[in-house]
Amino acid sequence: MLNFNAYLATYTKPIPNDPVDKVIRNFFSPSSNYTDMSDATRLFTIDKLARDAIPCLKQRYQAGRVNYKTTGCFMADLILYISLIVILGLVFARTIMAVWYAFVGSRRLASTPPPPGKFSATGMRRPRPKSHVAMPDGATHENSMGVAPWAQKGIVTPTPASSKNLPNNNVSLMTPASMTPEDIGNDPYIVCLVTCYSEGLDGISATLSSLSATEYPTNRKLIFVVADGMITGKGESMSTPDVCVSLMTPDMRFGTPTPMKYRSVSSGKKAQNMALVYAGHYQDPSGGESVPMVVVVKCGMPEEAAGQKAGNRGKRDSQMVLMSFFQHVTYNDPMSPLDYDLFRKIHALMGVTPDFFEMVLMVDADTKVHPPALRYLANAMLNDHRIMGACGETRIQNKLQSWVTAIQVFEYFISHHQVKAFEAVFGGVTCLPGCFSMYRIKARKPGFDDWIPVIVKQDIIREYSQTIVTTLHQKNLLLLGEDRFLSTLMLRTFPHRRMVFVPHAVCHTEVPHTLRMLLSQRRRWINSTVHNLMELLLVRDLCGTFCFSMQFVVLMDLIGTCLLYTSDAADDTPC
């Protein structure tokens, strides 16, 4: 409350070109609608110079304070304090739970699981798992070529002398009914999917070497490389498919592959695609055992051969090559020629039919996986059969390349050890990064006599393989952030299963090193985040109630993401 009587007595005449004096005299003019006890706050806040003079006027002419607040000021303060309490409470809760998860929860997941007992709780021997895959015609152990009938023409059968030098030649093949969960033990069959586009020799070789060096039995893991089209990276002398094939020691039983047709996730003329399947082993140049390896090269239809980027259909299509294959294997559905060729060659390489694979590790071609990472992720899956997806910590490989990479180090650390760790407490990690994540292909039922499809469930495959993308919402989900949308689909389809973060599993990847590249990446990420959080808001079965629920956390994340770049400093308006 200000008393301007002393001011008017001192300055009897108006001061020219003084906005503060003008406001005061307008307030006390006879033509004004204000009375002596009216609120003149709005008059002073309209003009910037008058607003800046408020502290000085309060110091010289303050007569007292109003002993009550107006309704507007009271509601503004109420909303402010409630928001402050909720936000600070959420931040502190996230931090405390993340610390607990780092020292207690995650260690339980990463610990070595107990060996599977041969007897159930009732004392009865567990039944042998049923063979839920009817092998296609010719997919028997008598077919030593391991390829489809239409691809056997012109293949040279190796002589007995040369066959002795082939990798894993002494592995005895097992029929699906000859192994039990006890025989598999704590080393389930895992396929490591590596999606490539335009990476060079150094990047792909580093990724394959890191997967080969993981502390996991070589006869229980399969490196599955998908080259997305006939692409040659900038500054590279070899195309990406040639690089992938050159790093593999081919299995002479298969000869020269034949292009096989499959249905891609594109539409129109690109709805059909063809791919070559190379099979063999990867041998790390630094030593170690050879690992079974399959390279799928998407070469395109014959009419694409003369064009640029023949066979290129995107990363989602590369993922669908594997996911669709295992869906057909799990559900015993009719197979495409490409699926059939994959079935034969994987069967011959691994010694078991592909239905034995339970998990898939998805990595990018520029990611280096630490040796214990695969084991830690597999342990988490075995310790809790409700887990359908898990990710590890992604660290920056080129953190000292520029100031742009350096500023991302702390952000990556917080996003994993606070955000993902907090979400993992409730089993609801909303985003498993596409560069390093593991998904469960199928889960064992309690009786060990059947399986529950997880990532290959028909609902997930149908939505993730949409070919007609028209709306802006669909484009942001399927074209800009397909990796995050896959996590959203998993949570929406299986709200009572878990998605976790395993900090013990570590990988290194390269991040954008220029500001232009970083802004382009973050624009895609923000668009994808907003649209995926909107999808998660519709999932009503997430754990918790009201403010103590994952749905409320998702809402807060959505509001924060939308307001992050539109927020501005609040006006210093006195109330």
Task: List PLM regions with ranges.
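Membrane-interface recognition of transmembrane alpha-helix starts
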Residues: K69-I87, C543-L564
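Conserved small/polar residues in nucleotide/adenosyl-binding loops
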Residues: Y565-D572
